[in-house]
C-alpha cells in the first residue's frame, strides 16, 4: 500500500544524499496534493538543482526506481538558472499548485504580475478552444466522444485561474471549486464526470458556449 509521507521522506533523503547543497527545492503537485489521488495516480514532484546536467537526470531516475512506485513517478526537475528564466505567464499557476517540501518555490521564480496571469488564462483558453473546435470538424464522432471528457478535465485549471482572477481566491481542490464557482462554471466542471452514453451534442454545446462566454469574461478583467 502506498504511503505518501514515507515516499516523500525517502525521496527527500535520497536526493539530499545524492545532490547535497545543490538540492535547492522540492515540492509536491498534482492529485496527491489536492487529495484526489487514487492507487495508480501520478506522484508529481518538482525539483530544482543548482546546476543541472544529463548525469543529474540519470541519478534522479535511479533514485526514483530505488524507492519504488517508479511507474507512478512524475513531475519536473530543472536547474536554478532555467527556472529564473521561466515563462512569467506560468508563475502564478506554479506557486498556487505546488506545496513546498524543501526550500521556497517563489525564491527561484521570476516575478509575475496580474497581467501575466490574465495572459496565461487567455492563452490556455485559446488553445483549448482551438482543440475543441478543430476536433469537432476534423475528427469522427467516435473520437470526439472519446476525447471530450478529457478536454473537460483540462478546463478545471482554466476555471481555477479564472475564478482566482475574478474573486481573489485560488481554490486548489476540485470539489471546493465546484461549490464556490459560478453556476455556469459548475455545469462545465461536472461535464468531466459524465457517464458513458452521455448526450454528446448537449454536452458539447454547453462547453462550446462556456468558452465563448469565458473570452468575454477575461476581457472584462483587463
What are these regions (language model features)?
Residues 1-27, 181:
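Helical scaffold of the NTase/Pol beta-like nucleotidyltransferase catalytic core
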Residues 3, 57-150:
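Conserved NTP/Mg2+-binding pocket subregion across the NTase superfamily
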Residues 16-17, 34-36, 144:
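Short, flexible, glycine/charge-rich loop motifs used to bind or transfer phosphoryl groups or to couple energy/partner
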Residues 21, 38-40, 86:
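A generic fold-level signal
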Amino acid at each position: 500500500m502506498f504511503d505518501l509521507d514515507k515516499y516523500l521522506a525517502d525521496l527527500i533523503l535520497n536526493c539530499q544524499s545524492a545532490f547535497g547543497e545543490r538540492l535547492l527545492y522540492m515540492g509536491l503537485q498534482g492529485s496527491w496534493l489536492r487529495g484526489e489521488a487514487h492507487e495508480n495516480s501520478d506522484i508529481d514532484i518538482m525539483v530544482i538543482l543548482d546546476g543541472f546536467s544529463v548525469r543529474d537526470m540519470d541519478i534522479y531516475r535511479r533514485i526514483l526506481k530505488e524507492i519504488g512506485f517508479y511507474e507512478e513517478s512524475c513531475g519536473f526537475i530543472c536547474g536554478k538558472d532555467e527556472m529564473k528564466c521561466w515563462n512569467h505567464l506560468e508563475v502564478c499557476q506554479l506557486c498556487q499548485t505546488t506545496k513546498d517540501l524543501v526550500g521556497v518555490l517563489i525564491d527561484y521564480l521570476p516575478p509575475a504580475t496580474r497581467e501575466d496571469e490574465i495572459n496565461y488564462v487567455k492563452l490556455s483558453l485559446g488553445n483549448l478552444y482551438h482543440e475543441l473546435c478543430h476536433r469537432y470538424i476534423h475528427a469522427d464522432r467516435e473520437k470526439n466522444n472519446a476525447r471530450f471528457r478529457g478536454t473537460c478535465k483540462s478546463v478545471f485549471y482554466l476555471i481555477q485561474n479564472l475564478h482566482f482572477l475574478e474573486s481573489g481566491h485560488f481554490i486548489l481542490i476540485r470539489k471546493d471549486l465546484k461549490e464556490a464557482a459560478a453556476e455556469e462554471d459548475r455545469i462545465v466542471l461536472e461535464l468531466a464526470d459524465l457517464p458513458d452514453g452521455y448526450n454528446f451534442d448537449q454536452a458539447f454545446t454547453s462547453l462550446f458556449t462556456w468558452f465563448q462566454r469565458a473570452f468575454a469574461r477575461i476581457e472584462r478583467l483587463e
